[in-house]
Amino acid sequence: MEIIEGKMPFMGYETYYRIVGERSEKPPLVLLHGGPGSSHNYFEVLDELAQKDGRRIIMYDQLGCGESSIPDDHPELYTKETWVKELEALREHLALRKMHLLGQSWGGMLAIIYMCDYHPEGIQSLILSSTLSSASLWSKELHRMIKYLPIEEQAAIHRAELTGNFNDPDYLKANEHFMNQHAIDMTKTWPECVMRKKRGGTVAYETAWGPNEYTPEGNLHDYEYTDKLSKIKVPTLITSGTDDLCTPYVAKTMQDQIASSKWRLFEGCGHMSFVEKTDEYVALLQEWLDQHDE
């Protein structure tokens, strides 16, 4: 199976991209990773989709992480506007006139911003994987789930939020426990691409989002797109897990606002159902993409 890696010039920096699969008449699937700052690595579990479906899959590292440039000395670049420009530049660079778009976590937010504010042409369908349409609802739901942690861990998180000290060992332990429960359990063994250490991303994450998943105090703190979701007119597949940071309430809120949407809930999965149930997820994607190529 052909894999092409390259770098695109962008704003005086470079954006790394990775194209999997043979050239095809089918519109490619473009993947937007989470974070901000998480890198494309974990998306490599979806490489098999390119072979099974005969369609190219394109993933890339957004500015600030992975194999792309990491201008941490210019954190003012880490905004939704920069990352939308980067997506548009990649479409132009790779001549992506028609494509499907999948965004996971922050990548889904980026996809929502792109669809609602920029009204792009040529998007055959949208896949919103474990994402959100409202920073305030996300924070509220995650704080609700924090109440299921042991009392001492709840207290450590509350104390860190009050003091702003997110380096306290008790907080770090509590947050790790929470993320292992609802993101992905890193005490387990996963494919190499999921376990692989990524480059950079911390400054991008803290600048744009915040110190953790449930304290959005970066420049995306006012991300509120629920009332804009009706602007999305393309077929939309929403996916999430029963144990996800993207709670069923968060996922249902999005489905209720997007007219041509369907929602698939993965039993027993956290924030990366495509990693935890790869075969099932790939089969779902293949069926969905084939239905919406035209």
UniProtKB/Swiss-Prot annotation:
Enzyme kind, highest EC tier: hydrolase
pH dependence, entry free text: Optimum pH is 7.5. At pH values above 7.5, the activity sharply decreases.
Thermoactivity: Optimum activity at 40 degrees Celsius.
Subcellular localization: Cell envelope
Catalytic activity: Release of N-terminal proline from a peptide
This enzyme's EC code(s): 3.4.11.5
Cellular component, GO annotation: cell envelope; membrane
GO function term, MF aspect, one: aminopeptidase activity
Domain AB hydrolase-1: 27-277
Pfam families assigned to the protein according to its UniProt record, in alphabetical order: Abhydrolase_1
Transmembrane feature ranges: none
InterPro entries: AB_hydrolase_1 (IPR000073), AB_hydrolase_fold (IPR029058), AB_hydrolase_sf (IPR050266), Peptidase_S33 (IPR002410), Pro_imino_pep (IPR005945)
Keywords: Aminopeptidase, Hydrolase, Protease
Catalytic residue positions: 105, 244, 271
GO biological process terms, semicolon-separated: proteolysis
Cell cycle as UniProt keyword: no
Function as written in the Swiss-Prot or TrEMBL entry: Releases the N-terminal proline from various substrates. Hydrolyzes only di- and tripeptides with proline in the first position.
Family: Belongs to the peptidase S33 family.
Oligomer status and interactors: Homodimer.
Protein name: Proline iminopeptidase
Lineage: Bacteria, Bacillati, Bacillota, Bacilli, Lactobacillales
